[in-house]
From Swiss-Prot:
Protein name (database record): Cytokinin dehydrogenase 6
Classification lineage: Eukaryota, Viridiplantae, Streptophyta, Embryophyta, Tracheophyta
Signal peptide feature range: 1-35
All residue ranges annotated as the FAD-binding PCMH-type domain in the record: 68-248
Binding locations of FAD: A104, G106, R107, G108, S110, Q114, D172, T177, S183, I187, I238, Y485
Length: 533
């Protein structure tokens, strides 16, 4: 009888616990529903120049990575900076009783939901871009342009070229917003010389997580200025930026050569980025694995210096390394530059029969990736999953990394480029939030693979993600000491490890400028505290 009594007691206890759990969850759900209803009502009452969209919001629930989909409560289309500040200040004043968060979205080129927020507010930053770009000090040694944080770099190029000027540092793809690239770093082949884009900013206007509008420079509000640059949107939203300019060339001499040996390829790259006087203006490189017909495709836009030898070059599936160079030209110095280029190339160790050159307009060179985008869109191959992996690898470990990754883990590069090139750490400002390896020279390794939707094979998302994990695991086991660029982690411990010595400063800045963790929740670094009482 005692056993039967105990069994009935356990069942009754379980029933009570289950009932209480259901009641508690129902109360929370009811509370959340009331909160959402209250949030919508209060947001609709905000005096905005622009507007909040509550119905057609699905376009803001995906990004270029095409792997995450978080549906927001609303999308803000700001027509003024005060629209952004008022919205954030309103959420800040609601305190922990609101679970609303805010994500700034430019072109949605994030890879893993970083510009998304579930049941929060996405700010469509391009709504700010109609503000006119202002170019200043055109005839001075230090010209600059003031632009909206939602402005596209391609538009900045078009406008500044009217004055014979252009920004010094770029990204490979120009159809991105200023605020988006400055929140990360902004790297391309000019970075060895000028540093990333975050090293070429004079001033910022920021809306903090409290809804404050602050102007900042290296001297004014310098803590916020340094924190926001490379800060992954955690401390504020960039609404305006002052970008350094330089005289723009008219043409570009564009060069590609091939190597069979990675060590020789890397040695030449390092020699070029350290050369006195910087003999080239742009230096990148990429890895070619299992690609057939490559040189034939180059002949569509490049000219072989030795066409017969180039046509006879056979690599039979071997891994190749392409060094890509550019020298800026003006009509009055073209012959001199061509001679300098010839002399510099003679010092390099590439396969001599694989020298390909062309001359293109400066604008066409900078916007070269957009040409590929147009082609991929026409084939329905642009809006596919992009499980990219971007790494910063210290110089002392790059050969070991190449042997392990390019020699074993990667089997082909037909579904996207693998970019490899070195930069000088001295051109990066260590006071910013951007994280790099400790060595003076480190490499960007960008494995930019596109996945085939629905594929379960080697071109499928899961297989590519498995390969990415293998690369990271190999690097960890080999002690490579790399850092992720455009990082994605899921735990506080991983973020702490990523930031290293900068973690304490990062947390302090978050507490100061966005203490409720309202901003940029898609990075999953900080969790917003919510009270259900």
């Amino acid at each position: 009888m005692s056993y039967l009594h105990a069994s009935l007691l356990r069942k009754r206890t379980m029933l009570i616990v289950r009932s209480f759990t259901i009641l508690l969850l129902s109360c929370i759900a009811f509370k959340l529903a009331c909160c959402f209803s209250s949030s919508i009502s209060s947001l609709k009452a905000l005096p905005l120049v622009g507007h909040l969209e509550f119905e057609h919001v699905h376009h803001a629930s995906k990004d270029f990575g095409n792997r995450y989909q978080l549906i927001p409560l609303a999308v803000l289309h700001p027509k003024s900076v005060s629209d952004i500040a008022s919205t954030i200040r309103h959420i800040w004043m609601m305190g922990t009783h609101s679970q609303l968060t805010v994500a700034a979205r430019g072109r949605g080129h994030s890879l893993q939901g970083q510009a998304q927020t579930r049941h929060g507010i996405v700010i469509h930053m391009e709504s700010l871009h109609p503000q006119k770009l202002q170019v200043y000090s055109v005839d001075s040694p230090a010209p600059y342009v003031d632009v909206s944080g939602g402005e596209l770099w391609i538009n900045i190029l078009h406008e500044t070229l009217k004055y014979g000027l252009a920004p010094k540092s770029w990204t490979d793809y120009l159809h991105l917003t200023v605020g988006g690239t400055l929140s990360n770093a902004g790297i391309s082949g000019q970075a060895f010389r000028h540093g990333p884009q975050i090293s070429n900013v004079h001033q910022l206007e920021i809306v903090t997580g409290k809804g404050e509008i602050l102007n900042c420079t290296k001297r004014q509000n310098s803590d916020l200025f340094n924190g926001v640059l490379g800060g992954l949107g955690q401390f504020g939203i960039i609404t305006r930026a002052r970008i350094a300019l330089e005289p723009a060339p008219t043409m570009v001499k564009w060069i590609r050569v091939l190597y069979l040996d990675f060590a020789a390829f890397a040695k030449d790259q390092e020699q070029l980025i350290s050369a006195q006087g910087h003999k080239f203006d742009y230096i990148e490189g990429f890895v070619i694995i299992n690609r057939t017909g490559l040189l034939n495709s180059w002949r569509l836009s490049f000219t072989a210096e030795e066409p017969l030898e180039a046509s006879q070059f056979k690599f039979d599936g071997r891994t190749l390394y392409c060094l890509e160079l550019a020298k800026y030209l003006k009509q009055d110095n073209k012959d001199v530059i061509n001679q300098e280029v010839k002399e510099t190339l003679s010092e390099l160790s590439y396969v001599t029969s694989t020298l390909f050159t062309t001359e293109v307009a400066y604008e066409a060179f900078l916007d070269r990736v957009h040409v590929s985008e147009v082609k991929l869109r026409s084939k329905g191959q642009w809006e596919v999953p992009h499980p990219w992996l971007n790494l910063l690898v210290p110089r002392s470990k790059i050969n070991e990394f190449a042997r392990g990754v390019f020699g074993n883990i990667l089997t082909d590069t037909s579904n996207g480029p693998v970019i490899v090139y070195p930069v000088n750490k001295s051109k990066w400002d260590n006071q910013t939030s951007a994280v790099t390896p400790e060595e003076e020279v480190f490499y960007l390794v960008a494995i930019l693979t596109s996945a085939s939707p629905g594929s379960a094979g080697k071109d499928g998302v899961e297989e590519i993600l498995r390969r990415n994990r293998r690369i990271l695991e190999f690097s960890e086991e080999a002690g490579i000491g790399l850092k992720q660029y455009l990082p994605h982690y899921t735990t506080r411990e991983e973020w702490r490890s990523h930031f290293g010595d900068k973690w304490g400063e990062f947390v302090r800045r978050k507490s100061r400028y966005d203490p409720l963790a309202i901003l940029a929740p898609g990075h999953r670094i900080f969790q917003k505290a919510v009270s259900y009482s």
